[in-house]
């Protein structure tokens, strides 16, 4: 079996952590049990580009139990958990191509390795795999039945490809499932981002000014958790509706040029480029801490910070100190990459349980229905979204009401008024 991981001797520790995560992923476990009996993915190859974490490991196990031949590479050079990668290879015989801290050349070499397996279905996190597949392997792209995308950033890229008419196969935007973005993006990103910042810095949040750039679902989660820790939260936005929502939610709202003067902590969660840039670094206070929890390391203008610095050193693990000409110091966390995965362990398993259940069921849906789908981006089918929610409620021991026949009739009628 071909693979490329750091050290297979780490596998035993990785296995323990995979099993620990599985305990908090009851929905995916139920799907895996069904997949092992029905084999809905039998004979299909699935290449996945995802963060190599304990939760991802349980998704890979589920797909393999469903009969698929599975290959995994990392969607971020700093998010790979080397013990998990080793465990997948050693104990589950799943080929993994991922090493924490790999350089850009190795990252793309690993991407190409899973593409060259000629997959029938692809799973992506940020659209690097799918875009590389289209640019470098157009012939292989023609043979793909369909794919799934996990993130807001990736969905934006893939919708652009569809609009330009270059997308060669249908995509299911798993990110757009209610049981994904309302929970993973908000509660998962919120908790894990704060976790990453605290692990990296060991700083007190209470009483500090905490700037959140972007008030989408991820930004909402980060802002809520920072406030819960006692921080004074400032939100920056370009969307007037989201800015108004942030204000109504009780947060300070202002442009980044004003927030930059106040902030002790900064977190970008926009999916856009250079949200924090030179003019903002120029007015930040000494000791400002800057982090990213969007997808790529482009939200913070790191080249500008490098140019401004007269000295640079790693002062703590995942903390780089940039000393400016006037003596001020700015601290960049995790090289501007995903702080929740680089400095912590990513989202809790309980929330990834829903996201990855959507992935597994969407893979099954593509295999069954690919002939009916066009080359565009689709939402997760409502029946899958609701099935995941019901399974999660059952796992939590929660029951809900059902509409009566009278209520169903009322909702489908127009004649009854005041």
UniProtKB/Swiss-Prot annotation:
Which SMART domains does the entry link to?
A: AdoHcyase, AdoHcyase_NAD
**Binding residues for NAD(+):** 151-153, 185, 214-219, 237, 272, 293-295, 340
Positions contributing to substrate binding: 53, 125, 150, 180, 184
Q: Which domain of life is it from?
A: Bacteria
Kindly give the InterPro entries that the UniProt entry links to this protein.
Adenosylhomocyst_ase-like_sf, Adenosylhomocysteinase-like, Ado_hCys_hydrolase_NAD-bd, NAD(P)-bd_dom_sf, S-Ado-L-homoCys_hydrolase_CS
Copy out the cofactor comment.
Binds 1 NAD(+) per subunit.
- Catalytic reaction equation(s): S-adenosyl-L-homocysteine + H2O = L-homocysteine + adenosine
Q: Which UniProt keywords apply?
A: Cytoplasm, Hydrolase, NAD, One-carbon metabolism
- GO cellular-component terms in the record? cytosol
* Family under the similarity heading: Belongs to the adenosylhomocysteinase family.
Task of the protein: May play a key role in the regulation of the intracellular concentration of adenosylhomocysteine.
Q: What is this protein called?
A: Adenosylhomocysteinase
Source organism of the structure: Aquifex aeolicus (strain VF5)
